[in-house]
Amino acid sequence: VRAENGPTCIVMRPSADDPNKTKFTWLLSIDLKGWIPKTIINKVLSQTQVDFANHLRQRMADNSVSKEMAPAC
């Protein structure tokens, strides 16, 4: 499969409503260039993004991850 990645961006900003929360915005543009219908691809990709966010949330909540270890962008 020869996929093409378009513009992709992850933005994390403090929540305006709760200082203990972060607003996570992920823009993803990918064309898999295959025969699979785009409706199926979009559903799978959106679920993959949800899974990624859940794993990220779980990792950040883990007590073994300290703020000092978090990489800077």
Curated annotation (Swiss-Prot):
GO molecular function, one term: cholesterol binding
GO biological process: cholesterol metabolic process; intracellular cholesterol transport; regulation of steroid biosynthetic process; steroid biosynthetic process
Localization of this protein: Mitochondrion
Pathway it works in: Steroid metabolism; cholesterol metabolism
Domain of life: Eukaryota
InterPro entries in UniProt: StAR (IPR029866), StAR-like (IPR000799), START-like_dom_sf (IPR023393), START_lipid-bd_dom (IPR002913)
Signal peptide: none
Alphabetic keyword roster: Lipid transport, Lipid-binding, Mitochondrion, Steroidogenesis, Transport
Catalytic activity: cholesterol(in) = cholesterol(out)
Claim: Transport is one of the keywords in the record: yes
GO CC, one annotated term: mitochondrion
Pfam families hit by this protein: START
Domain START: 1-65
Subunit structure: May interact with TSPO.
Entry function: Plays a key role in steroid hormone synthesis by enhancing the metabolism of cholesterol into pregnenolone. Mediates the transfer of cholesterol from the outer mitochondrial membrane to the inner mitochondrial membrane where it is cleaved to pregnenolone.
Protein's name according to its UniProt entry: Steroidogenic acute regulatory protein
Gene transcribed to yield this protein: star
